[in-house]
Amino acid sequence: MAFNMDPKKCPMPTQDPNVRNKNFEEVALGYTAEMAVNEAKRCIHCKNKPCQTGCPVGIDIPEFIGHVAEGDFEAAYQVINRSSSLPAVCGRVCPQESQCEGKCTRGIKNEPVGIGRLERFVADWHRENVHTAPIVPASNGHKVAIIGAGPAGLTAAGDLAKLGYKVTVYEALHVAGGVLMYGIPEFRLPKAIVQQEIDGLKKMGVDFECNMVIGKVLTIDELMGEYRYEAVFVGSGAGLPRFMGIPGESLKGVYSANEFLTRSNLMKAYLPTSKTPIRTGKKVAVVGGGNVAMDAARSALRLGAETVYIVYRRGMAELPARKEEVEHAEEEGIIFKTLCNPVEILPDENGFVKAITCIEMELGEPDASGRRRPIEKKGSEFTMDVDTVIMSLGTSPNPLIRSTTPGLETNKHGCIVTEGDEGKTSREGVYAGGDAVTGAATVIKAMGAGKAAAKAIDEYIQSK
C-alpha cells in the first residue's frame, strides 16, 4: 500500500461560518469515504504505536486506520468497538490534539494523522450501513448498578454488559447521556447520535432508570442491600457550577454556563412555547476560556445575540479550550477580550444586567497549574455594556451522594477519593470515576475511568 506523504490533514468539510452561526446543525460535516481512505494512508504504522498510548481507552489506532486505508470500514469499526462504547461521540468531541494526535509521529514535522476525524467517519459509516443486532453475552448471574448515565457510566455499563453482567443505570435527569446531552450543543454533538449509542447499550441488555436521584430517591446502601447489587459504580459527574463571588452575580440575566446550556440543549428553553424560557440578550459576556465557555458563547450567538464576548483573564495562548473550538468561535464572530477579569456586574433600574466592569490583567510567574499567574493592573478598570452574563468557571460534584453514603471518602473539593486508576473507593464494592472523582475534565478521560472501573469491578466480583 502506498503511503500518502501529504504534510497536512485532509481538510474537514464544514458549514460556512456566516450560515452556521444562525443554526444548530452540525458544524463539521464529516469525511467522504475517499477522504477517509486518503487520510488513513498518511499513517506510517510506527512499531511502538505512540498514538495508542495517548488514548485513554486504549484503541488500537494503527490497526483501525489500516483497515480504513484498505477500504474495510466495518473491520475498522470492530477494532474501535473492542475498546470504546461511544466512537461516534469521541470522534467529535475528544481533544485529540493533546492525546492520540499529540503523540502521532507524523506530527513531529507535519500535521498529525486526523485520528479523530477517521474515528468519526468509521462510527458514522457503521451506523448508516450496518443494521445487525449486537451480540448479547450470556448472563453471568451478577448485578451491578451504575449511578449516572454520562460518559463514565455509559462506558462502564457497556464493558460490564459485554462480560455478562446485568447492569442498571440510574440517571437523575429525564434522559440518559449526562453531559453529552445537556452540556454539549447540537452543533458539536447531535443528540440523535448520542441516543443511538445509548440504544445500542439497551440492545445489549443494559437497563436505564431515569428521574432517579441517588441520594434522594435511593441511597447506595439501599442499592447494595435491599436491591442486592454486588457492586456500584458512581459516575455522577460534576454539575455544581462555580461563581466568582463578585457584586452583581445574583442579578437577572446572569447564568451559569451549566444552567444556560442545560436549558438550551435539553429543555429547548429558547422556544417561544417553553415553560422555562431563557433570556438571551443582544450583548452577551461569557466569562471563562474552556470548551464550555466556547459552547455557551456560540450557543448565545445562535439564539439571537448580536455581540458575544469571551472574557478571559489570561491570553489567547493560554486558552484551555480546544484549538478547533477557538478557531470556530472566531470564524463565527465571537469577540475575545483576553487579559481582563470581571470585578462587578452592574444593574439597571429593574434589576437586570446592564453592564460588566472588568480590570486588565498581566501575566506573572507560573502558578501551581504551570500557567503564568494573571495579575491585576491597578487603575485599569473599564466597563462594557452587556445585558447577559454567563459564568463558565468550572464545576464540582454535587454533595448529595457523599452526604448520604457513610464512609465514602471525599477530598476538600467534594470529589470522591479513589485508589490508583481502578476507581476503588473507601467503601467496599463501591467504585467511582469521571468528573465525580477528577472534577470537570474531558469526555474521553471519563470514559477511560469507566473502562478501568469496569475491569476492577469484574475482578472484585469474580474473586468473591
Describe the role of every protein-language-model region.
Residues S250-G281, P366-A440:
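FAD-site-proximal beta/loop scaffold in flavoenzymes
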Residues R20-N38, I59-R92, K109-V136, S264-N265:
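Ferredoxin-type iron-sulfur electron-transfer modules in oxidoreductases and energy-metabolism complexes
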Residues K41-E63, S85-I108:
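Local cysteine-cluster metal-coordination motifs and their immediate loop/turn environment
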Residues A75, A138, K143-I147, Q195-I246, ...:
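Feature captures the FAD/FMN-dependent oxidoreductase FAD-binding
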Residues H142-T168, A293-L301:
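N-terminal Rossmann-like FAD-binding beta1-loop-alpha1 element of flavoenzymes
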Residues V169, L173-K203, D207-F208, A297-E344:
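Rossmann-like dinucleotide-binding cores of NAD(P)H-dependent redox enzymes
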Residues V122-A138, Q196-K216, P241-L303, N411-D421, ...:
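Glycine-rich dinucleotide-binding loop and its adjacent helix/turn
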Residues A436-K464:
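A conserved FAD-binding loop/helix module that cradles the flavin
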